[in-house]
Amino acid sequence: MCEVMPTINEGDRLGPPHGADADANFEQLMVNMLDEREKLLESLRESQETLAATQSRLQDAIHERDQLQRHLNSALPQEFATLTRELSMCREQLLEREEEISELKAERNNTRLLLEHLECLVSRHERSLRMTVVKRQAQSPSGVSSEVEVLKALKSLFEHHKALDEKVRERLRAALERVTTLEEQLAGAHQQVSALQQGAGVRDGAAEEEGTVELGPKRLWKEDTGRVEELQELLEKQNFELSQARERLVTLTTTVTELEEDLGTARRDLIKSEELSSKHQRDLREALAQKEDMEERITTLEKRYLAAQREATSIHDLNDKLENELANKESLHRQCEEKARHLQELLEVAEQKLQQTMRKAETLPEVEAELAQRIAALTKAEERHGNIEEHLRQLEGQLEEKNQELARTAVQVRQREKMNEDHNKRLSDTVDRLLSESNERLQLHLKERMAALEEKNTLIQELESSQRQIEEQHHHKGRLSEEIEKLRQEVDQLKGRGGPFVDGVHSRSHMGSAADVRFSLGTTTHAPPGVHRRYSALREESAKLALPLTVTLRSPTWMRMSQGVCCNLEYHSSGTLCGSSGPLPVPEMIQEEKESTELRAEEIETRVTSGSMEALNLKQLRKRGSIPTSLTALSLASASPPLSGRSTPKLTSRSAAQDLDRMGVMTLPSDLRKHRRKLLSPVSREENREDKATIKCETSPPSSPRTLRLEKLGHPALSQEEGKSALEDQGSNPSSSNSSQDSLHKGAKRKGIKSSIGRLFGKKEKGRLIQLSRDGATGHVLLTDSEFSMQEPMVPAKLGTQAEKDRRLKKKHQLLEDARRKGMPFAQWDGPTVVSWLELWVGMPAWYVAACRANVKSGAIMSALSDTEIQREIGISNALHRLKLRLAIQEMVSLTSPSAPPTSRTSSGNVWVTHEEMETLETSTKTDSEEGSWAQTLAYGDMNHEWIGNEWLPSLGLPQYRSYFMECLVDARMLDHLTKKDLRVHLKMVDSFHRTSLQYGIMCLKRLNYDRKELEKRREESQHEIKDVLVWTNDQVVHWVQSIGLRDYAGNLHESGVHGALLALDENFDHNTLALILQIPTQNTQARQVMEREFNNLLALGTDRKLDDGDDKVFRRAPSWRKRFRPREHHGRGGMLSASAETLPAGFRVSTLGTLQPPPAPPKKIMPEAHSHYLYGHMLSAFRD
């Protein structure tokens, strides 16, 4: 701003006339200056006001800038370096994902091309392949090739990939649509950002325009102008900084948008990857659903097969019930026959009395005619009984034919079930077709079974009709008994009228004293010769019947009746009896005779009614589990369990009706065979060693005439005194017979004991059998109804068939003995020898033996069979049964190898010797029989599956697995080859502690070299004292827990798997584990302290585990006593074992330790334990699946 000074006008050169004008001009100048100053002051005031406004606006702009800065700082992250690093990482991941996507697309294109090519090929060659498959199936219907599976799998693969392609296309289309929508949204967002930026530029221009200050053309003071200039510079700086901040804000917003775009792409990639993972998961779920569907189909098919099998078993049970009912009908018929015979005898007695009275009083021809009519009626009744008996035999024949047809259908069902199982394993994709075929077959079988059931119903109706006929016979016999009563009354009347003819009759002895009865023939000379002969024949017949009646009819009422009959015969046959009582008066004699006749009539009536009621109510008695009084006659025919108690199955408690009504089959155990070999003759011993022969075991009916005939056949020379002694023995020991009967009924639920009395009665040593029947300790033998029915009409034919069986069994043993003596390798054995070996040594079931007999012709074929061939040809579907057969084959191949000397095992079970040494042993110590065969020299011959199931498993405390072990026929030979899968799947041993317990039990057997006698001996020695805990059973551990004062907790050890070998060998088993098993509470510190103290004492006294010196007090295994000794020199036997070990297979281990001696000094060289090597410890990995 510049100051404008007023212009000074130069005056006139004239001077004075112009002075007044100059003063006026100065005043005017001063007025103008004052006006100008006022204007300047007003302009200054306005400028100051504008400056204040601009300053206020500047403050507002600064405040707005600060707000924007704070907003920017809050919106943007603090660390730009980490943000950029994460951005670079996201970009790298994005590139990797893009590369993976490109690779997957390439692979997908390649697979699409390959699938299209395969589809073209399959569609081109499908018809020819189907024709070849059809031809191949027509040629070999048993096996089906896998081309059908390949075709169906390829078709399913094509369809699956087409479905996947369609899904991928749909997802790609949806992703593209989403990308277009997102791009449109992004374009809209960009437009909004540009519009906002333009709006910000307009606001900046307005601010800049408003910030300029126009200065008037007036001059200002220097201070004011300087301040204004400084304010303008400051405003320019602030505007510049504001523009810079806005530029930075724009750059930051661009970076933020870029980052948001990168984040969106990363999110899209993540979504795509999640979609891929979800797609894979859905595919996996679909595959699992398909798998579950297939498993459900397989389970439904198995359920249908099981239902068919249950139907077959129900039909078998129905068949057994029908047979049982038929046996009951036979027993009822026999009782009827017996009672008819007794009635006939009583009638003959009455006829004898009548003849005597006729001799004394010849004036009674009418009575004789009436008696003749009664005799004719009785003969007609006997003829009717004969017709009924023939009808029953015909019904029995028809029932046996139906049983054979049922057996054949059962065999067909088993074969078809096995075929179905094979097809299920091979063709899992064709289950529907197999299901329809199996349904058709099952419907056919159902129709056949329904027809068989209808036939059986007709048989039942016929049996019911025969039962009605028998009841009619009973009524007829009742009428006959009433007629006999009438006859007796008439006889009494005749006696009353014929008093003078009975003067010579003396008083008779008491009715029950049969020992004082004597026969006097003094008065028989007066009778006619025919009458005398008839009387003598009748007396001989009654004398013959007296003994069997005494032996068979055990009840006191039958005894009294038989004695009464004998006394009555004596009384009426003789005119005088031994006695000195003198003649009685005639009325008293007549009264006494009348009373005795009435008593005998009452006894006959009670016998008839009680016999019929017992026969009719036999089923009810059996359902109640009670044994009628007439069943006491079963003492000779009852079967107690064997002395060892190992063959009787241990069953849970069931109802008496189930124990009596259910019947099954059971194989003869080796202990029972040994017991019979000791007791019976050599011929019967050879016969009783027949292995796995099964027979239906039924409850024996009451004694019948067949029993009488068998007893006559068994001991014809038995005197009356011996019969009385047998009767006294039976009466004195009823508890033993009842207990044996009860044990028989309990054991007969599933398995029956093979009856052999039919064979025993046909042998020469009958006196020995009679001794057996008397001796209660040796047990009794059960007579089945089938053998009764076979022995009664055709005893010679039965003996002939039994001799044939004996001859066949002896021939089988002879074949095995010849093969052993000749030292023939197993590959050179012929078919009969192999079948005999399977039947007598291995103990395979009869079904497998029959299949081997049909398919295996030599030992070479048997040893060359693979696992699949064993399953397919022989039909052994159980894997453990196949393992049993493979181990037996491997054992025989090794033992009969031509390079090694043939070996056998002595009765001790520990030493393997050659045949020459065995013969020397046999010559030095003769056995009780000439059985040099393999029955007693077998490896593990005394540790068969019955010993494992009945003795060994309960001794380990694992009796709950007995049925599974028995079903899989697990013997000691198989124990070391059981895998975890076998234990879990086949033997249902899921508990790991139970498997551990079983493993330590097997280790105990290894340490004893699988010697059963040694095991039993050591258990017996350690039964009453704390030593040799290794062989303790579960019961001994329970007894020990009870003895230390923990009786309340001892019951928890049952079925727990705790035994001595587990305590002695398991390092991890301590007192805390035992307390946990005993379920001793942790609060009961006293009981736990007692357990700890006694457990440590038990380990110190009875095991090799010792306590460490440390604080933890953990028991450790001390070196075994076997490690402390050197093996002694084996001389010849050690050389033999080493030579035989060279010829055995690679996996076959031989124990080279013989009997060990204690060393002279402790510091000896430590040798390995003997239990790590034993003869049958080899693993047959080649045979395993």
Curated annotation (Swiss-Prot):
Main location: cytoplasm
Gene Ontology cellular component list: cell surface; cytosol; presynaptic active zone; synapse
Domain SAM: 829-895, 944-1008, 1032-1101
Gene Ontology terms: biological process: synapse organization
Tissues in which the protein is found: Expressed only in the heart, brain, and skeletal muscle.
InterPro entries the UniProt entry points to: Liprin, Liprin-alpha_SAM_rpt_1, Liprin-alpha_SAM_rpt_2, Liprin-alpha_SAM_rpt_3, SAM, SAM/pointed_sf
Coiled-coil portions: 24-123, 165-499
Sequence segments annotated as region (Disordered): 638-709, 721-757
A Pfam match: SAM_2
UniProt keyword list: Coiled coil, Cytoplasm, Phosphoprotein, Repeat
Gene3D superfamilies named in the record: Transcription Factor, Ets-1 (1.10.150.50)
Modified residues (Phosphoserine): 640, 681
Biased composition (Polar residues): 645-656
Function: May regulate the disassembly of focal adhesions. May localize receptor-like tyrosine phosphatases type 2A at specific sites on the plasma membrane, possibly regulating their interaction with the extracellular environment and their association with substrates.
Subunit-structure text: Forms homodimers and heterodimers with liprins-alpha and liprins-beta. Interacts with the second PTPase domain of PTPRD, PTPRF and PTPRS. Interacts with RIMS1 and RIMS2. Interacts with GIT1 and GIT2. Interacts with GRIP1. Interacts with KIF1A.
Domain comment in the entry: The N-terminal coiled coil regions mediate homodimerization preferentially and heterodimerization type alpha/alpha. The C-terminal, non-coiled coil regions mediate heterodimerization type alpha/beta and interaction with PTPRD, PTPRF and PTPRS.
Family: Belongs to the liprin family. Liprin-alpha subfamily.
PANTHER family named among the record's database cross-references: LAR INTERACTING PROTEIN LIP -RELATED PROTEIN, LIPRIN-ALPHA-4
Protein name: Liprin-alpha-4
Gene: PPFIA4
